[in-house]
From Swiss-Prot:
Alphabetized UniProt keyword annotations: DNA-binding, Plasmid, Transcription, Transcription regulation
KW Transcription regulation (keyword) present: yes
Protein name: Protein KlcB
Chain spans, region Disordered: 253-311
Molecular-function GO terms, alphabetical: DNA binding
Record text about domains: Contains a DNA-binding region joined by a short variable segment to a region similar to E.coli korA and trbA.
């Protein structure tokens, strides 16, 4: 459900300026704009849950128009720092940490796939609130994960008739399934992550998060001792060990806090102080009509079409149609996840591999193989585009028929 491409601006017109009719509907004061942003987020989520692509885009345009107006009539610098208009609105509309956010609403929550638990940070991706950026952080450092670093980033789009946590859980499950063998977090990353505390809302997690480092570091004033004792004396050693473990944990926490203060304020993707309690306004249109949904049905790509949108060539209103890419198909790039790659729009590619669970394809440039003559006078390959492949999302491509 990616945002449609804007029409080219006329000469002298600001290409990023919202439509005049959208601006006319917006309040003039700051408090009114912040309230309108919360309402826009709720509308975005309700439209996505209904599978209504056109309504979701309209609400997304309104959200972006609010940022444009609060930023002084321009998009330039709207996400530059914590006090920029885009960041202020993002924090104001953020979900309560631990609650599943709405589509277009920044937040943190827990995703579980089998024995793997991940702290998920969700935010709107580049290009508007209908684009999605998921960040997966390992909770249990001694268990397999989707990355040897304990972290994985994934760009996607809003999925019709699916909640944010359903999509995140499906992505996590798909990434685990594509691993041929369990991937353990490497020792150096595990040691570093062990010093990074989890958010407070995970303090009551059951069972508790396993955050022990791979390398045992003994703080000054402590000594690691391996000892074999008779049973009647072992209880004393156990009591000493328990007391020492508490002191070691406190020493590590103090050292971690000191590092945080020295490095400046840590990033808080969804601060509880500025969070709006609009995460309870979840639309239940799809679930109410369809009844209980099985875990398999919530997986991305499960069953029939998942209400995803494919764009018309003229960038007209969104239609809920199924785009099923297959190897060998020729496609045109219609959108990118970051403006720096805007020059790629319009390029034609050939699909090599399809991953339906994560809604991604591997493709190479649609160019012929070129040859040259080497010093021995033989004709050899000069450039083979199939040797360089890139990953694209389903919504970034348009099938060329």
């Amino acid at each position: 459900m990616a945002k449609r491409t804007k029409q080219p601006a006329q000469t002298g017109q600001d290409w990023s300026a919202p439509a005049a009719e959208l601006l006319a509907e917006l309040p003039a004061d700051r408090d009114g704009l912040l309230a309108a942003a919360v309402a826009a987020v709720v509308e975005i989520d309700a439209a996505v849950m209904r599978g209504d692509g056109a309504a979701a885009e309209l609400a997304g345009d309104r959200y972006e128009a609010i940022i444009w107006k609060l930023n002084g009539g321009t998009n330039f610098g709207c996400m530059a720092d914590d006090e920029a208009a885009g960041r202020v609105i993002e924090r104001h509309c953020a979900a309560v940490p631990g609650d599943v956010p709405l589509w277009g609403q920044r937040g943190q929550f827990l995703a579980v796939a089998g024995d793997v638990r991940a702290l998920v940070e969700y935010e709107a991706g580049y290009g508007g609130p209908l684009n999605a950026h998921f960040q997966f952080h390992a909770v249990d450092l001694d268990r397999p994960f989707i990355s040897a670093t304990g972290y994985r980033s994934h760009f996607d789009t809003a999925r019709g008739c699916m909640t944010v946590d359903e999509v995140a859980r499906g992505i996590l499950t798909a990434m685990l399934a594509e691993k041929k063998r369990p991937v353990l977090i490497e020792a150096n990353y595990r040691d570093r992550l062990a010093d990074a505390p989890l958010p407070d809302w995970l303090a009551g997690l059951v069972p508790p998060a396993r955050r022990e480092p791979a390398t045992v570091t003994i703080p000054p004033g402590f000594v690691l001792v391996d000892v074999v004792l008779p049973a009647h004396k072992a209880f004393i050693a156990r009591r000493w060990a328990a007391e020492a473990a508490g002191k070691v944990k406190a020493a590590r926490a103090a050292r971690s806090n000191a590092k945080g203060k020295a490095g400046g304020r840590e990033r808080d993707p969804a601060s509880a102080e500025t969070a709006m309690r609009c995460s309870t306004a979840k639309a239940d249109d799809c679930k109410a009509e369809a009844g209980p949904v099985s875990p398999e049905a919530t997986m991305p790509g499960a069953g029939e079409a998942s209400c995803s949108t494919a764009r018309n060539g003229d960038a007209g209103p969104a239609d809920l149609v199924e785009f099923t890419p297959a190897p060998g198909q020729r496609c045109e790039i219609v959108s990118v996840h970051h403006p720096v790659f805007a020059k790629e729009i319009g390029k034609r590619v050939i699909i090599v591999k399809v991953h339906p669970d994560t809604r991604q394809v591997w493709a190479h440039d649609d160019r012929p193989v070129t040859y040259k003559t080497n010093r021995a006078g033989r004709r050899v390959v000069d450039s083979d585009p199939s040797c360089i492949q890139s990953i694209y999302g389903f919504d970034q491509l348009r099938l060329i028929t």
